[in-house]
Amino acid sequence: MAVESAIRDLVQKMTAERGILLGQIEKLSEKEAEYVPQDAQGEAQWTAKEQCAHVAEMEAGYRAWVERALEEDNPDLTDVRGGPVAVPLEQANKHPLSRLVAELRRQRNETLKVIERLRPIDYDRRATSPMFGTLTILQWLRSYYRHDRMHQAQIAGRKSEYKPHFIKGEPDQRRTKPL
């Protein structure tokens, strides 16, 4: 069972890392936010706007996984998808940065509402994803702020210190740009 200090630490990190990401993004001009890094690979090739849309999509998806784990014992998450986001990744560059930032704020607020409902014992519930394997709700939720850190680095043009542990494949590689 998750102890209160671990839960407080989780919420603090989720709030802090999202704040850092939003601060970084809000400093960009529209032109800077649409810049395509030419020497990057995978998700690092995306514009800052595409990064924002992706983070929002993943937040909605991870939250759907957490919700399913609350409903069912160790569910298979293969077909579980998050709800729609304001701006899908494929349309990100057609929208103002302010709309993407607002969606990132909205998505995090929705996640924090889910966390408020959780009992300490709920954090031990598990769910299994073909991409990541079996994780507890606490592990799924920790992945949010780690994901934020990864995209902070990518937007800044740095190599991320955080590398997700994929069991099978990598998400969103189908949407990378050809070099």
Set out the residue ranges of the language-model regions.
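Solvent-exposed interaction patches of small proteins and small membrane subunits
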Residues: 5-12, 34-40, 95, 99
